[in-house]
């Protein structure tokens, strides 16, 4: 019988970013208790040798599984040391891969308080509203003018440590164009 290949999207991520993300997940699971129902699977609990960890996030009758890998082939740059992240949405026997932005939105639908557009209606009706959104990563668009006006009145409280964002985990911070210093800056960068 020949080998059967399964292709999946794995986002290349440096190991320090993965370590930070894992510790944020564990902090909010065990200390702050904001990630209720989340399940963390260690590398030694997996049968796959390249799986570094898995985080299972229940979303109603479905779940989001964020798998971190190690020992993959290195990427284009030296610092891509074979670390990666796959994001999968599962419901019963069906599963599909999702991008980091959608993963954050799905998490935000089920977890963490939000100062959402429904707060505008409640504020107009005189009801008390939640003063802030705890999970800004779950929003990918600019709100309405009313929403922006109300949000400007209330300064968001910084959560320490921040909530774990899948989009932030997979963000490519290495391949952004570098800004060189001006004339008084580094002379090796501008050729003088």
UniProtKB/Swiss-Prot annotation:
GO BP: viral life cycle
Extent of motif HCCH motif: 108-139
Residue span of motif BC-box-like motif: 144-153
Main location: host cell
Region (Multimerization): 151-164
Region (Membrane association): 171-172
Skewed-composition ranges (Basic residues): 176-186
Region (Interaction with host APOBEC3G): 40-44
Residues found modified as Phosphoserine: 144, 165
Molecular functions per Gene Ontology: metal ion binding; RNA binding
Post-translational modification Phosphothreonine, affected residues: 96, 155, 188
Positions of the UniProt region annotated as Interaction with host APOBEC3F and APOBEC3G: 54-72
Keyword Ubl conjugation in record: yes
Membrane topology listed for this record: Peripheral membrane protein
Record site feature (Cleavage in virion (by viral protease)), residues: 150-151
Binding of Zn(2+), residues: 108, 114, 133, 139
Spans annotated as Disordered: 161-192
Post-translational modification, as annotated: Processed in virion by the viral protease.
Protein task: Counteracts the innate antiviral activity of host APOBEC3F and APOBEC3G by promoting their ubiquitination and degradation. Acts as a substrate recognition component of an E3 ubiquitin-protein ligase complex: mechanistically, Vif hijacks a host cullin-5-RING E3 ubiquitin-protein ligase complex (ECS complex) and the transcription coactivator CBFB/CBF-beta to form an active E3 ubiquitin-protein ligase complex that targets APOBEC3G and APOBEC3F for polyubiquitination, leading to their degradation by the proteasome.
HAMAP family (UniProt xref): HIV_VIF
Family the UniProt entry places it in: Belongs to the primate lentivirus group Vif protein family.
Subunit structure: Homomultimer; in vitro and presumably in vivo. Interacts with viral RNA and Pr55Gag precursor; these interactions mediate Vif incorporation into the virion. Interacts with the viral reverse transcriptase. Forms cullin-5-RING E3 ubiquitin-protein ligase complex (ECS complex) by interacting with host CUL5, RBX2, elongin BC complex (ELOB and ELOC) and CBFB/CBF-beta. Within the ECS complex, Vif interacts directly with host CUL5, ELOC and APOBEC (APOBEC3F and APOBEC3G) substrates.
Free-text note on domains in this protein's UniProt record: The BC-like-box motif mediates the interaction with elongin BC complex. The HCCH motif (H-x(5)-C-x(18)-C-x(5)-H) mediates the interaction with CUL5.
Protein name as catalogued: Virion infectivity factor
Organism, scientific name: Human immunodeficiency virus type 1 group M subtype B (isolate ARV2/SF2) (HIV-1)
Gene that encodes the chain: vif
């Amino acid at each position: 019988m020949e080998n059967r290949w399964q292709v999946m999207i794995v986002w290349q991520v440096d190991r320090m970013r993965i370590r930070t993300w894992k510790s944020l997940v564990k902090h909010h699971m065990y200390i702050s208790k904001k990630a209720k129902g989340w399940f963390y699977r260690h590398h030694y609990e997996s049968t796959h040798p390249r799986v570094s960890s898995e985080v299972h996030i229940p979303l109603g009758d479905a779940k989001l599984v964020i798998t971190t890998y190690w020992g993959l082939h290195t990427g284009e740059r030296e610092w891509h040391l074979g670390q990666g992240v796959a994001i999968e949405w599962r419901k019963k026997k069906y599963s599909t891969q999702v991008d980091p932005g959608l993963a954050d939105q799905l998490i935000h639908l089920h977890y963490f308080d939000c100062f959402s557009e429904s707060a505008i209606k409640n504020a107009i009706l005189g009801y008390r509203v939640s003063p802030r959104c705890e999970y800004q990563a779950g929003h990918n668009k600019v709100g309405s003018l009313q929403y922006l006006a109300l949000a400007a009145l209330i300064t968001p409280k910084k959560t320490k440590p921040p909530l774990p964002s899948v989009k932030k985990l997979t963000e490519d911070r290495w391949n952004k164009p570098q800004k060189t210093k001006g004339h008084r800056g580094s002379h090796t960068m501008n050729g003088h």
